[in-house]
Swiss-Prot record:
PANTHER family, sorted: FLAVODOXIN 1, FLAVODOXIN 2
Gene: isiB
Role according to the record: Low-potential electron donor to a number of redox enzymes.
Entry's induction text: By iron stress.
Record's protein name: Flavodoxin
Species of origin: Synechococcus elongatus (strain ATCC 33912 / PCC 7942 / FACHB-805)
Similarity annotation: Belongs to the flavodoxin family.
Cofactor: FMN
Pfam families per UniProt: Flavodoxin_1
Keyword entries, A-Z: Electron transport, Flavoprotein, FMN, Stress response, Transport
Amino acid sequence: MAKIGLFYGTQTGVTQTIAESIQQEFGGESIVDLNDIANADASDLNAYDYLIIGCPTWNVGELQSDWEGIYDDLDSVNFQGKKVAYFGAGDQVGYSDNFQDAMGILEEKISSLGSQTVGYWPIEGYDFNESKAVRNNQFVGLAIDEDNQPDLTKNRIKTWVSQLKSEFGL
């Protein structure tokens, strides 16, 4: 099976925990390389044909600081032919008007650079007003809400990883 590069940013550790769960659901570190974007360069994304990008929405609809720091550097990455999946951590109750915005901001940027987005996720089961991560009535990736729906996280990850295995062609 091809190596998958999972790049995540985290402020409080929630996104890292989700990333580790995704890695384990895929079968461990022999399949998925975990990369904290705080310790990586944008050019590190070039090493993989399959990418998973994880980012919490921070403050009011903003990118997590480490993703914000390399956002412009993403222009130098060759995303042509890469399949990219996204996951986000957010609070649909406290931040209903910008739930998962960071995931949408990153997907919009990276897809504009030639990648193919995979891993779309249904909006059913969530209660929010607005999100930059919704396209055609679906999230652009897996939406996790550990603040309000922690009991759903494990099953959502399991279902999404199964979907990704198929969409990545693995």
